[in-house]
Regions:
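Switch/connector loops and helix/strand junctions flanking conserved nucleotide-binding motifs
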Residues: 14-17, 88-90, 116-120
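Short, low-complexity, polar/charged sequence segments that are solvent-exposed and flexible
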Residues: 24-27, 98-100, 127-131
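Conserved P-loop NTPase
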Residues: 107-133
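P-loop NTPase switch/communication element
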Residues: 1-45
Length: 133
């Protein structure tokens, strides 16, 4: 199965595009929207590119959550990051709680803030822990 992936790189931190060309490896066939807000990027991608997966960073407020909901409702999977101290704390934020209650994400990966992003825990779409092997 072929995966059509897209990346919304709002601040240029993920793909580090120079003259429209990603300098970091984001996948050979990944469409990158550089410098475009999620609120503009998600609808544009859904209408024009029909990706299976949309990657974006740092969800924070209600507008970001609405973008994820729009992508999810149109059948696209979303890969996103959120800064937080624990899954429960993040899931209970008013702006993001609807994403968790509707189970918009299949997997939650918790990373340590120390040691270069070491995986500290995995949780399924219901928030149940998945053992690390």
């Amino acid at each position: 199965m072929s995966v059509q992936a897209a990346l919304i790189d709002e601040r240029g931190e993920l793909a580090a595009c120079v003259d429209g060309v990603p300098q970091l490896d984001v996948g050979a066939s990944t469409d990158v929207l550089d410098g475009l807000p999620k609120t503009e990027g998600v609808p544009w991608l859904i209408r024009s590119m029909a990706p299976n997966v949309i990657a974006m960073d740092e969800l924070s407020g209600a507008e970001d959550a609405a973008c994820v909901m729009d992508a999810w409702a149109c059948g696209a999977s979303v890969l996103a990051t959120v800064h937080g101290t624990a899954l429960a704390e993040t899931a209970n934020r008013p702006a993001l709680s609807s994403l968790f209650s509707r189970r918009c994400f299949d997997l939650y990966v918790l990373l340590s803030s120390e040691g270069g992003g070491k995986i500290t825990a995995l949780h399924d779409r219901c928030g149940s822990p998945i053992p690390l092997s």
